[in-house]
Design a protein with these regions (language model features):
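Substrate-binding rim/cap in mid-to-C-terminal beta-strand-loop elements of soluble/periplasmic
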Residues: 211, 445-497, 512
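Polar, surface-exposed loop/tail segments
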Residues: 436-441, 479-486, 494-529
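Beta-strand elements within well-structured catalytic alpha/beta cores of enzymes
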Residues: 170-191, 205-206, 229, 292, ...
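A long, amphipathic alpha-helix that forms part
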Residues: 142-173, 350-371, 376, 386-437
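Juxtamembrane "helix-exit" motif on the non-cytosolic side of transmembrane helices
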Residues: 10-27, 86-101, 125-128
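Active-site-proximal alpha/beta segments of enzymes that process anionic O-linked groups
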Residues: 44-68, 73-100, 104-120, 174-175, ...
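Cytosolic-side transmembrane helix boundary signature
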Residues: 109-143
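Histidine-centered active-site microenvironments of extracellular/periplasmic hydrolases
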Residues: 163-168, 430-469, 521-522
Length: 542
């Protein structure tokens, strides 16, 4: 139980390193120390107790020792050290794009200290007998590790607040914008679809613009990926790190998202269930539409998460609100029927996905026609819903027809939106993430199991893509080395707006034609803090 208490005390600063914005006062820190220590004593200590009891059946000596055995203590603290080491290094690896570099470095230091502690204990347990005052020495050694881990957390620099404008900055955007996000699409799926003739509009526009793959957020989390796309900032800066957030009222008033991964189910690493579910977080930096609205443009948004607000907003339709599959074009339904009959267990889900996508597209086109806007941002999840279930393992399968019809629907919606916005509109089509089969390592885990059908998924953060076409874009250009955060920075530059210094993205100059690059300077502002009234703080129309 004492070993478990030390484990809880050592894991607490690792969890705090995952929460850079949490800086509790001393009293709350003491409460946190007691909470995690008692949690570790019960759960980790209870596990170690069961392990020691089981081991005593094999090694009777362990059960015959009276009092506090220093030798047994060392052998119990070795797995504690291994758990702390693994937790520090694993969470550092699993927060590549989600955590500030200083905090990830703190996890690396913590893992190294725990590894050194474990190796030292292993050497002592094997090669040395307990000396005089061995108990005091053992407890002091473990206390030193806990102290060092808390010192690592205390010495980690706090995050910098967003730079504020001294006065309102005045900018005048140029042109119109159509910003389309197709989740779950990528070039390996898109290019063949265009070659087959499934996407004639996009194929026609392809040579008029610049395109390339996008490195997405790693590890994959949809919430962080979308927020990175529309803010141009890293997740650690815009603050949206995952789908689920929690409130820990006895520690901080701020919602927290990242939880320490380890051999325990989430969210039970938060002690004693003293937490509450929190609603989804909104980005702490202004989104693309907020920046545009702050300059005076009318912006429509459709299909984005709940934090999206524009001059008008089309939310993601619910199943009950959609017109239904029966209301779709008869020729479209007739082309789908053979494929749907081949997989009746998936047919209802596919019909629902098509109906929702069609409802979102038609509602958005109607809004643009009746309430014209200067910019439109729309997000569609159709491909992300259908590809994992309908991707065919063999060419020529009837399953392919479902995805072909999905490509045709997306292309037709894109054409309708582009015509509604006007031909002189800057067109941006982007996929924040792609889909790919499981990696060889994931397949190896299931080696020897029952035969299974592998599904494509975004788990390994496959690359997405970006396509830009319109005023200021260099035609017939292949982009290389582009990242997801680069999209918003490039769009702002093409619309004659400044780029924020705290954005992780850069302007994709290869996508800009020479005339614009020579005539339009790259302007920078400190930041675009989110204004909860709907705009970007410190930016106004000229």
């Amino acid at each position: 139980m004492v070993a478990g208490a030390f484990a809880g005390a050592a894991l607490a600063p690792l969890q705090l390193l995952l929460w850079p914005d949490v800086s509790p006062p001393l009293v709350k820190l003491l409460v946190a120390f007691v909470a995690w220590t008692s949690w570790g004593a019960l759960w980790i200590g209870g596990s170690l107790f069961a392990f020691a009891e089981f081991a005593s059946l094999v090694v009777p000596y362990l059960g015959a020792v009276k009092g506090f055995s220093v030798g047994l203590w060392r052998w119990l603290m070795i797995p504690v050290g291994l758990v702390v080491t693994w937790a520090a290094w694993w969470n550092r690896e699993e927060t590549r794009d989600l955590l500030l570099p200083d905090n990830r470095q703190g996890l690396a230091y913590a893992g190294s200290l725990a590894a050194l502690f474990t190796i030292t204990l292993l050497v002592l347990a094997i090669g040395r007998r307990p000396r005089r005052n061995a108990l005091t020495r053992a407890l002091a050694f473990a206390s030193a590790l806990v102290t060092c881990l808390w010192a690592v957390w205390a010495l980690t620099p706090p995050p910098r607040p967003p730079a504020a404008f001294g006065e309102a900055v005045h900018f005048a955007p140029a042109g119109r914008l159509l910003f389309v996000s197709w989740e779950g699409t990528d070039l390996p799926w898109l290019l063949p679809a265009m070659e087959r003739g499934d996407m004639p509009f996009l194929h026609k526009r392809w040579e008029t613009g610049a395109w390339g793959q996008l490195r997405t957020v790693r590890p994959y989390t949809r919430s962080a990926t979308l927020a990175t796309l529309v803010t141009g900032c890293a997740p650690a800066v815009h603050g949206v790190l995952g789908r689920l957030s929690y409130r820990v009222p006895w520690l901080t008033d701020q919602p927290v998202t990242l939880l320490l991964a380890g051999p325990w189910p989430s969210p039970h690493q938060l002690p004693w269930r003293a937490w509450e579910r929190a609603s989804g977080l909104a980005p702490q930096r202004a989104t693309l539409w907020q920046v545009l609205m702050a300059t005076g443009l009318r912006v429509g948004v459709a299909g984005w998460p709940r934090y999206a607000r524009g001059a008008w907003t089309v939310p993601i339709p619910l199943s009950a609100e959609a017109a239904g599959f029966a209301a779709l074009d008869p020729d479209f339904k007739a082309a789908l029927e053979p494929a749907l009959r081949s997989a009746p267990d998936l047919a209802d889900d596919a019909k629902s996905s098509f109906a929702l996508a069609a409802a979102l597209g038609s509602s958005t086109v109607n809004r643009v026609s009746t309430q014209p806007v200067d910019a439109l941002a729309i997000d569609c999840e159709l491909a992300a819903h259908l590809r994992p279930l309908w991707a065919a393992e063999e060419p020529g399968s009837q399953r392919e027809e479902v995805l072909r019809q999905a490509a045709r629907l997306l292309d037709e919606q894109l054409r309708s939106l582009w015509l509604a916005m006007g031909e002189d509109t800057l067109l941006v089509v982007v996929s924040p993430y792609g889909l790919a089969p499981p990696s060889p390592w994931q397949r190896l885990v299931h080696l020897g199991g029952s035969p299974r059908r592998w599904h494509v998924s975004p788990t390994d953060s496959p690359d997405g893509f970006v396509f830009l076409s319109g005023p200021g874009v260099r035609p017939a250009t292949r982009l290389t080395g582009a990242r997801l955060a680069d999209v918003t920075a490039t769009v702002l530059y093409l619309m004659d707006l400044p780029v924020a210094r705290d954005m992780a993205g850069r302007v994709l100059l290869d996508a800009v034609d020479e005339a614009r690059a020579a005539s339009v300077p790259l302007r920078l502002v400190p930041s675009y803090p989110a204004d909860r009234s709907g705009g970007a703080a410190g930016v106004s129309v000229r």
